[in-house]
């Protein structure tokens, strides 16, 4: 197995949440986005009486996690599926003590997957977390959607203020040839952007919008939220790490809508990475952690 590139985000804060939990034999920790097992590995090392359910739709990443967590064999159950599908079939009689959903993309996908998540790669513009399931790829969308549909997609799923300029450039390029690689798309978007100072790559929001659409990320989050809280045990905790305002708003509004008698929001404001974490892990800079506790059934 290649080196694990992904550094788990807000790990210390998540461990602190577990410290405050009443951990006893049979404690169940569900990692909804197992990735390469960073969070789960730390949890399993620290707590000998915790069992982990690890979920990931990407079978390649799941196999990497199995290798990295091999020392914990017998304490981890693996499920190769979307987290919303897993919880739609989860038996309510088997309650969960702690659910973690880190909604970020694994560094493996950016660095090693070959699926077009990274700006500067000359690889197929795909962006599907599980290509085997079929469905539209980013290549299909960027080369076939009409002007209005592309404008709406990019603006609504990222808030990109220059979506019209970007789409105009995309359509002009399509007259010459298809857009095949992330590098091509990044170049098109960057040239369409006005010459202003940015802290991020000009193509960041366009890539975000495509990835969200391709993997139906917002639908899966909205579907999962009620399933997650329903699956929690008394005093069970749900911790969600988001990476953009669309996800964060969905989680915030859902938490606010829950019964204050039955649930307690543990984060009036989201927990953000400390300056030190941002320095050694730049991928954490936009992370926000929101946490809720179930008081009783």
Swiss-Prot record:
Residues binding S-adenosyl-L-methionine: 37-39, 56, 87, 102, 109
MF GO annotations: rRNA (cytosine-N4-)-methyltransferase activity
InterPro entries: RsmH, SAM-dep_MeTrfase_MraW_recog, SAM-dependent_MTases_sf
Enzyme class per UniProt: transferase
GO CC entries: cytoplasm
Main location class: cytoplasm
Highest taxon of the lineage: Bacteria
Gene Ontology biological-process annotations: rRNA base methylation
Subcellular location: Cytoplasm
EC number: 2.1.1.199
Catalytic activity: cytidine(1402) in 16S rRNA + S-adenosyl-L-methionine = N(4)-methylcytidine(1402) in 16S rRNA + S-adenosyl-L-homocysteine + H(+)
Any matching Pfam family: Methyltransf_5
Cited HAMAP family: 16SrRNA_methyltr_H (MF_01007)
Protein family: Belongs to the methyltransferase superfamily. RsmH family.
Role of this protein: Specifically methylates the N4 position of cytidine in position 1402 (C1402) of 16S rRNA.
Full protein name: Ribosomal RNA small subunit methyltransferase H
Organism: Borrelia turicatae (strain 91E135)
Highest classification ranks of the organism: Bacteria, Pseudomonadati, Spirochaetota, Spirochaetia, Spirochaetales
Gene (UniProt): rsmH
């Amino acid at each position: 197995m290649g080196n694990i590139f992904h550094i788990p985000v807000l790990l210390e804060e998540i461990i602190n949440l577990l410290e405050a939990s009443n951990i006893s034999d049979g404690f169940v920790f569900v990692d909804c986005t197992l990735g390469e097992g960073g969070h789960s590995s730390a949890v399993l090392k620290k707590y000998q009486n915790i069992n982990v359910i690890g979920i990931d739709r990407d079978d390649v990443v799941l196999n990497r996690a199995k290798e990295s967590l091999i020392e914990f064999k017998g304490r981890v159950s693996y499920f190769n599926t979307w987290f919303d599908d897993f919880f739609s079939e989860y038996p309510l009689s088997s309650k969960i003590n702690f659910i973690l959903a880190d909604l970020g993309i694994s560094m493996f996908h950016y660095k090693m997957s070959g699926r077009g998540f990274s700006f500067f790669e000359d690889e197929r513009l795909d962006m599907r977390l599980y290509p085997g399931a079929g469905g539209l790829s980013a290549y299909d969308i960027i080369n076939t959607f009409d002007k209005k549909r592309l404008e709406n997609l990019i603006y609504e799923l990222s808030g990109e203020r220059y979506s019209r300029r970007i789409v105009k450039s995309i359509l002009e390029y399509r007259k010459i040839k298809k857009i095949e690689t992330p590098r091509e798309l990044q170049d098109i978007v960057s040239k369409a952007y006005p010459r202003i100072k940015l802290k991020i790559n000009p193509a960041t929001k366009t890539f975000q919008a495509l990835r969200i659409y391709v993997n139906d990320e917002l639908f899966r989050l909205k579907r999962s939220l009620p399933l997650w809280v329903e699956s929690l045990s008394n005093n069970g905790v749900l911790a969600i790490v988001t990476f953009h305002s669309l996800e964060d708003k969905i989680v915030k509004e859902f938490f606010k809508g829950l019964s204050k008698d039955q649930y307690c929001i543990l984060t009036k404001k989201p927990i953000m990475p400390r300056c030190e974490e941002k320095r050694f892990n730049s991928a954490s800079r936009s992370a926000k952690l929101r946490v809720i506790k179930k008081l009783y059934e």
